[in-house]
Amino acid sequence: MGTISSVLQWSCTKCNTINPTESLKCFNCGTVRKVFPQQQQQQHRSSSITASWTADDALEQEQAEKGQERDKEKGRAAVARSEYKHVYKSLLRGCLKRPQRNSQNLPANCVDCEDTRKYIKSSIELYRHFSNPALNRRWVCHACGTDNSSVTWHCLICDTVSYLAPIYKDAIAADRGQDLAGSLGNRGELLAADHSHPHHHHHYLHQELEEQHQHQLHSQHLHKRHLKGRSASGSGSGPGSGSGLRRTQSLSTAIDKSASGRSCHICYANNQSKDIFNLPQIKPAPQLTGIPPVAACSNSRFAIANDTFCRRKQNNNNKNQNHKVVRESGAKRKYNFTITTLSRSAAKDAGHGQMKPLRQVVNLNLNLQQEPQQKSPANPQQLQRKTQREPAAVSMNPTQFTIPRNGVFIAVNEWSEPMASSSSVSSSSNHHHHHHSNSNSNSSGNSNIINNNSSSSSGSNKLYENECVALAQQQLRAAAAQAAQAAATAVAIASSPSAKAMAEPAPTATMPIYAQVNKQHKLKKKQQIASESQTNNNTGSGEIADAVSESLTAGLGTSTDGSGEASESESQVEEHSIYAKVWKGPRKATESKIMHDPGSSSRLSGAASAAAGTASAGAIAAAVGAAAASRHDNKTQLGNGSRSKMWICIKCSYAYNRLWLQTCEMCEAKAEQQQQQLQLQQQQQQQQQHHHHHLQQQQAEAPRDEPWTCKKCTLVNYSTAMACVVCGGSKLKSISSIEDMTLRKGEFWTCSHCTLKNSLHSPVCSACKSHRQPQLSMAMEAVRERPDGQSYEEQDAAAVGGGGGSAHQSGANEVKAPTALNLPLTSVALPMPMLQLPTSTAAGLRGSRSPSPRMQLLPSLQQQRNSSSSGAIPKRHSTGGSIVPRNISIAGLANYNLQQGQGVGSASVVSASGAGSGAGAVGASTSTKKWQCPACTYDNCAASVVCDICSSPRGLASAVLGEALGRKSVRVALTPADIRQESKLMENLRQLEETEALTKWQNIIQYCRDNSELFVDDSFPPAPKSLYYNPASGAGEGNPVVQWRRPHEINCDGGAYPPWAVFRTPLPSDICQGVLGNCWLLSALAVLAEREDLVKEVLVTKEICGQGAYQVRLCKDGKWTTVLVDDLLPCDKRGHLVYSQAKRKQLWVPLIEKAVAKIHGCYEALVSGRAIEGLATLTGAPCESIPLQASSLPMPSEDELDKDLIWAQLLSSRCVRFLMGASCGGGNMKVDEEEYQQKGLRPRHAYSVLDVKDIQGHRLLKLRNPWGHYSWRGDWSDDSSLWTDDLRDALMPHGASEGVFWISFEDVLNYFDCIDICKVRSGWNEVRLQGTLQPLCSISCVLLTVLEPTEAEFTLFQEGQRNSEKSQRSQLDLCVVIFRTRSPAAPEIGRLVEHSKRQVRGFVGCHKMLERDIYLLVCLAFNHWHTGIEDPHQYPQCILAIHSSKRLLVEQISPSPHLLADAIISLTLTKGQRHEGREGMTAYYLTKGWAGLVVMVENRHENKWIHVKCDCQESYNVVSTRGELKTVDSVPPLQRQVIIVLTQLEGSGGFSIAHRLTHRLANSRGLHDWGPPGATHCPPIENVHGLHAPRLIT
C-alpha cells in the first residue's frame, strides 16, 4: 500500500499541499480540486467521431493537419516556456517535502533547478501520503444524482463509476486502440496498394520524412507533451499531432545514487540550461540512409529524459521501503523511470528487456537496420511510407522503460503520451520496424542504451477522469464490433492474394480497471517470472517464424520484436479485462492467466512479422499458412490451455503454477519433486491404456459367431450377447485370459512402511516408493510378541534349527513366499531358546497358530500333566527331553501332540532329526544344553526333568502356555477404546448420554404421532412374564395384578384433580410402597428425594408424554444405561396401582420402579435387597457400607467395633450431604421378631437416614420407613418423655409425621445391621472399564497413571444376580488391590498402596489419596476357580469404576504369568498375621477383611527345603484354590509360596475356617512319605501355577 499511496495524490494549486486522490478538497486551505476542463470534454466528444473515419479520410486529414500545425507552432513557441513552467511549478511544489530544518532555505520558485541544485541534492525528499483504508469518499453520482459516501467508486444506486475514480495507464492505450478500430479496419487494402506502387510511395514518403526531421529538431524545444490544444484530426501522421500524456522521468542508473541505491524524479529543468548532474546535451541525431527519422515526440521524450532529473534521499521513516526496493530493482540498467507507474502488463516488457545485454541489443538493432538496405533496398522506402501512416507506438522497445508494476495511473488533465494499443499492434505487425539508435554517454559510464521511442500518430483522444464512465460503455460496445472485424479479417487473409502479408490477431476488447490497487501480490522474483514468461512467448513465435527465416535474417529478428509487442498488447487484454468495483485484496500473479493463452497472439504476430519482411511470395504464403495453422491449433487449446500449462504443488496443493516455473508461487517448493509423481502417473496411464488395448484386441480377435461361457454363472450365452442374460456378467471378462489382479498368498510382499501388498517382481512399493527390504530383515521386523515375553519367530526359527535339515527340507517345498524359515540356516542369526522341538512343515507352523485356547490343546496338556505327575523319568538324551518346553508355539505344541499320538517320543524325534544334517545337529546340540524353569527362571541342565532350585517340573510350561493363551483370547475381544481411556467429568458424560437418548426418544414419538398410536414397550410388555420369573406359576392364585392401565385410566382417591405429573416437588413422604418387597429401592428413592436435583437426573423425560414413552437413566452393575419404558402400570381389578406409587398423582416413583424391574427382568426380581444397591443403581456414585455388628464383619474379628469412629463417619458423611440408608435386622444378626415389632421396627427392612445430629450430648439419627407408617416406639419416639421443648422445637418444628422418627445411636447399633453411604459428589471425573474374571488366573489388570495428586474411589462390580431366582444365584468374592509399579512397559508388583475388603457381594470398593505416580490395579476373585467353566464366553464379567477429583489415565494390560502370586504375597506380607514356625521359616495368615483365609510360607534357608502340610478339612462354606482342603508342598530355599487360599462360598450364610499347619526341613525337594514319589506339590499346581508357584525372595 505504501507505493500506491505515493502516487495517489495531487498538489494544491494554492498552497502546494500534497493531498491524496480520495480527497476532493485540500487538507490545508480547502481549495476544491479542478476535475472538469471544458476543453477535454469537447475533445472527448470528437473522439467518438474519429473511430468512424475511413483510412482515406484520415490520410487527407493528416496532410491538412500538418500545414496548420506548423503555422501554429511558431506562435506557440513564445508561450511554451511559461506554460510548462506553470505546469511543473504546481507539480514540483506538490511533490517536494520541505524539511523543517531547511524550510527557511527553500526558494520560492523551484522551476529553475540550476539555481537550486545544491539544495535539491541535499534536501529533496519525495513526500508520500500514507493511505487511509477507512477513508470515506463523498461524491455525487452524475447519472442518478445520489450523494455517495463510501470507500468504493461505484454508485450505490445505479452502480455507475465515479468521474473521480483513478484509472490505469493501460486503459488509456486500450481506449486509443478502440478509437482506431474502425479506421484501421480497411488498412489492409491500403497496404496492398502500397506494395503495388513502390516508386510513387517512395517519393511521397521521402518528402514527408524530410519535413518530419526538420520539425523534429524544432520540437525538441517546444515540448509537445504539455500542449493543451490538439487537432481534430483523428489519424494524422504529422509530427505535430503526436501529443499524448506526458510523464516525468528519471535516470535511475545515470547518477551516483544514495546509500540505498534508489532514485526518483521530482523537478523539471529545461533543455536549454545545463543539466544539474552533468548530463550531456541532446544533439541532433544523424539520419542514416534509408532509415526513417524518429518522430518529434521520440526525440522530445529522450531530451526530456536527459534534462529531467530529481534526487530522493533515503527516508528512514518511510514505511514502504521494502516496496521501494522492489520498484527500483526493476529499473536497474535502464534510463527512464516514471512516477506514473505501469501495472502488471509491464512485467513482460521488463522481463524481455532483461533477457538481452545492452550491447547485444544495440548490435541487434543496428544489424536489423542495415540488412534490409543490403538485401532489399526498395523495402525501406516502402516501409517509410507505411511507417508514417501507422502508429509508431508499436515499436516501443522493452529496454527503454522499466517501470514498477505495482501502482495505478492517475490521469492528469494536461498531460498525454503515446501508448501501444492492441489495434495498433495488430495493424502494423506486418512491417519492419526500424528503430533510430540514439546513443548517449553519461557521467556514470553506462553502456549505450537504445532509446526506441516512436511518435504516435493515432487519433486517440486524451483520457481524463471524467471520461471513465464513457470509456467503460464504449469498451462494451466495441467488443462485438471487434469480434466481427476479426472474423472478417481472417476471411480476407484467406481469400485475398494481396492480403497474404497480414496475419494480425483478432483485437480483444479491453475493459478498464477502476480504482484497483496493489495488483501484484507476489513481489518476490517477479522479474524472473516476467523474463520467463517473455521467453516462453518468444519461443512460441519463433517456431512459426523459422519457416520463413531462411531467406531473410531480418524476418527472424523482427519476429522476435513483434512477439514482444504482441505480448505487450495481449497482456493488456489479459491482465486488465476485469472490471473491479472495489479493491478486494491483492490478486495472485496468475489470476488473470487462467482463462487466456498467452502464446496464441504472440505466435500469430511473429509469423505475420516474418511474412511481411520476406520478399518471396512463396515464403509469405508459407508464413500465412503457418500462422493460420497456429491459429487453428490455439483455438483447440484455449479450452484447456490454462490447465495444461499449470502444475499442482504437492506441498501446498496450489494448482495454478505455470509450467515453466521451477518453484511453487505459494510455498516456493521446487518443481523437481513433481517429476517422479508425473512419471508415475504417466506409467500408470500407459499401463491402463495397454491393458485396455489388450482387452479390446482380445475381444476383437474372439470369434464372433461362437457362443461364450460366463465366468460368473457358467451359462453358455449366444455370440451376439454382450452380457450374460442371467447374471449380467461381462462378456469381455469371460472370454479374455486376463486373470484377476488380486495377488494371492505367496505372490506378494508387504511394504513395511505403508503395509501395501506388492507383487514379488516389484522392488519398490507402488504406493510409498519404499524399497523392498531383504527377506531376513523383513522376517526380523515381523516379530510377534508372545504372552510370556518372547516372540513366536524366535522359537519358530529355533524349532527349525533344532529340527535340523529334515525339517527344513520338508517345509521348503510348501512355502511359496520367502520367509526366514526357508533361508539357509547359517544366515538366520536369530536368538535360540534353550530347548525346542522340531516341526513337520513351516507352513503348518505358521498357518495353524490361533489365539483360541480351545484348539485340541487341553487333552494333550492333560496327558502331559498325568505323565509328569506320575514320577516316571524318561530316558535321558543329550539333545532333548520328553517335556514340552516353555517357549513353544501353538503350532509347535500341536505338532508335538500329533507326534505323541503316533507313539513317537520327543527324545527320539529330536535325535533322528538331529542326525539328518551336520549343521542341524550342531545347532541342536548347542541350543538344548539348558532349559529355563518357568517358576524361578533358573537355567537347568538338559538332563534334569525338574528344576534344580524350585523342583518345578518341565511340564509346567504347558500349563503356563495354556494360561497365556486364555488371557490372549480374552484380550483380543477388547477394543482399543476399552483398553486405554481417560477419566471425564460425570456431568459431561450424563449430558452426552441424555442427548443421544433424546434423539431416539424423539424418533419414537414422531412415529407414534404419524400412526396415531400410543407407545407400547414390546421388550417389557404388559404381560405376566414382566411380573414373575415363572409366569405360569406366578400368575395363578394370589396374583394381585389384573390389568395394565395408563395414568389417565388409573383410579385414585383424589379423583381426576390434580392432573398427572412426573414431578411435583418430590418429597420423601410422597413414596408409598406396594405389595412388592422392594424396600431397598424405595428407601434409596426416599434418600434421593431429599435432593430434588438427583431425582430429576434419574428421569430423562421430565414432562408428561402424550404417547406414553419415558426414559430413565440407571447404573446397572456399574454401567450406565438409558432405559425406555411405557406408562402402562400394573393395577388390580379396581384400577388401583398394585406396586409402588407416589402421592399427589406423581409418576416418578412407578416409572423408576418399572425401569429397574425391566433391567433385572421382571418385578419379582426386585424382592429383597440392600439400600446400598439401590443407591448405586440410581446414582452410579461409589458406595460404602459401615457394619454395625461384629457378626456383620466379613471375618469374625477379636477387635470390637469402634463406635466413636462409626459416629464420626456418619457425621462427616451428613456434613457433605452424602446419601445414607440403614439396614434393619439383616445380615448375620439374630432377630427376635416380637421384640422388633414392640419397638415399631420391621426386621430385614431398609430405612432411609435423613439426618444425623449430635445435640446437647445426645447422638440422634432421623430415619424414615418407606412404607410411610409404622414408626419407632422406643426412646426418642414422638411420644417419648426424653424430648424437651427446646429439642422438640429444634428437631421436630412441624410435629411428628407418619413413618419418620428419631432414634438414638445406641439403639441403631442394637437393632440395625449396617449403614450404607452413597458418596455423591459434583465436579468429579469417572472412568469405567470392562473386564473378565477368568478362573485360574488374573486377567483384569489396569495400569493407572496419576498426573497430579488426587482423591480416588475404586469400585469393582460383578454381573448382577437378580435376573435369576435366588436358588440359582452365586456371587463371586471380589477384591481390588492397588500397587505401585515402576515401569509402565513391563509393570511389576511393587509396594501395596490400598485394597478393598474381600466380600461376596455385588460390588466392593476402597478410597485412597494418590500421589503422582504409576499404579497397578489387580482385580481378584477366587470362589469360581473350580466350577468347571470352560467356555470363555461364560466367564464372569466385571466393571471397574474409578472416580477421582482430578483426571486420570487408565490402560488395560495383560498381566505377567506370576502377577497373581506376587500380588497375594505382597498383600499377605503387608496385611497378614506373622507366625514364626521355626528358624528360617515364617508363616503368614490373612484373615481379617478377607472373607476367607490366605496361608503363605517363607523359606529363608539357603540349602534346605521346607515341607509344609496345611489341613483345613474342618472348615465349612469355603472353597480352596487348590481344589482340596488339605495340601502338601515343598518350598524351595530362599523362596515364598502361597500355600492355600480359602474363600467364602455363599455370601448370605456364615462360614467357618479351621486350619492346621505342619512343617519340616528337608535336604531334597521330594515329599518322601508325605506325597507320591517324585512329587513336590500335592495336589499338583500346574493348573494354578500363576498363584501357587514358588517365588524368589526379593
UniProtKB/Swiss-Prot annotation:
Gene: sol
Domain Calpain catalytic as annotated: residue spans: 1014-1321
E.C. numbers: 3.4.22.-
ZnF (RanBP2-type) residues: 1-35, 135-164, 643-673, 704-733, 744-774, 927-956
Miscellaneous comment in the UniProt entry for this protein: Although homology to other calpains is high within the protease domain, the lack of calcium-binding sites suggests that this protein is a protease that may not be activated by calcium ions.
Name of the protein described by the UniProt record: Calpain-D
Active-site residues annotated for this sequence: C1079, H1245, N1265
Function summary: Has a role in eye development.
Record organism: Drosophila melanogaster (Fruit fly)
Region called Disordered, residue ranges: 210-256, 371-400, 420-459, 524-543, 554-606, 684-703, 786-811, 860-884
Biased segments, Low complexity type: 438-459
Uppermost EC category: hydrolase
